[in-house]
Design a protein with these regions (language model features):
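ANL superfamily adenylate-forming
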Residues: 39-81, 190-205
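Conserved pre-ATP/AMP-binding loop-to-beta segment of ANL
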Residues: 70-89, 96, 120-126
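Conserved S/T- and glycine-rich ATP-binding loop of Class I adenylate-forming
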Residues: 3, 34, 84, 90-93, ...
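Conserved G/P- and acidic residue-centered "switch" motifs that form tight phosphate/ATP-binding loops
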Residues: 7, 92-93, 150
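Conserved AMP-binding/adenylation subdomain of ANL enzymes
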Residues: 108-126, 133-205
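Conserved AMP-binding A3 loop
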Residues: 85-111
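Short hydrophobic alpha-helices that are characteristic scaffold elements of the AMP-binding
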Residues: 1-6, 28, 147-148, 187
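Structural core segment of the AMP-binding/adenylate-forming
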Residues: 5-67
């Protein structure tokens, strides 16, 4: 949001993508800034060695926290809604990843459509983000639409079943948007924990 507010084009990348795919994306879109964390430092350094265009690198966990408060500027609509706001790269299953350029108009139309036609988002509901935000579906349905109506988003520390359950306990989550494979992974994780104990296995059998 900070990037978009300042007129930047945002390119979310899957941190689990292969080094080759990340290198391809960076060489293709040629970003000026790359935000990551120290956890990915080894991969980033290996990728940077083969880049023709090297962006400025920012490790988010090394940025000094500024606790000072300042007035938040009200959101201003972009002067050119046709301007590219986000570039989403495909998974590259049929070749190299391809960048899909989405304008501000695309995003606004998507969010307004989802908010109006899928009447599940309200100000008092919390939405748990489960899917990665480098895909359009979770970007619009799990992040942008809830915030658009004044709702709350919740992010789990990881996809581990224990973290998910802990997140659900601590927050009043009303909506979880996912895909069948994701729910299957959650089910298998929970079932493995149930099967590991004779007591729980007896109770849930």
């Amino acid at each position: 949001y900070s990037g978009i507010q300042n007129g930047c084009v945002v390119v979310p990348i899957d941190y689990l993508a292969s080094r080759d795919d990340v290198s391809y994306i960076l060489n293709d879109c040629k970003p000026d800034l790359l935000f990551t964390t120290s956890k990915q430092q080894d991969d980033v350094e290996a990728i940077f060695a083969n880049l023709s265009h090297k962006p400025e690198l920012v490790y988010l966990d090394k940025v000094e926290q500024n606790n000072s408060t300042r007035e938040v500027k009200p959101w201003e609509e972009p002067s050119d809604v046709e301007k590219t706001a986000v570039i989403i790269y495909t998974s590259g299953t049929t070749g190299s990843p391809k960048g899909v350029m989405l304008s501000f108009k695309n995003l606004i139309a998507n969010v307004r459509s989802v908010s109006k036609d899928v009447e599940i988002y309200t100000e008092d509901r919390q939405v748990l983000i489960l899917l990665p935000l480098h895909h359009v579906f979770p970007l619009a349905g799990s992040l942008m639409a809830p915030l658009y109506v004044g709702g709350t988003i919740v992010i789990s520390p990881s996809m581990q079943s224990t973290d998910l359950l802990d997140t659900l306990k601590k927050n009043r989550v009303a909506i979880m948007i996912g895909v069948p494979r994701l729910y299957e992974m959650i089910y298998k994780g929970l079932k493995a924990k149930i099967d590991a104990s004779f007591v729980t296995r007896t109770i849930f059998a």
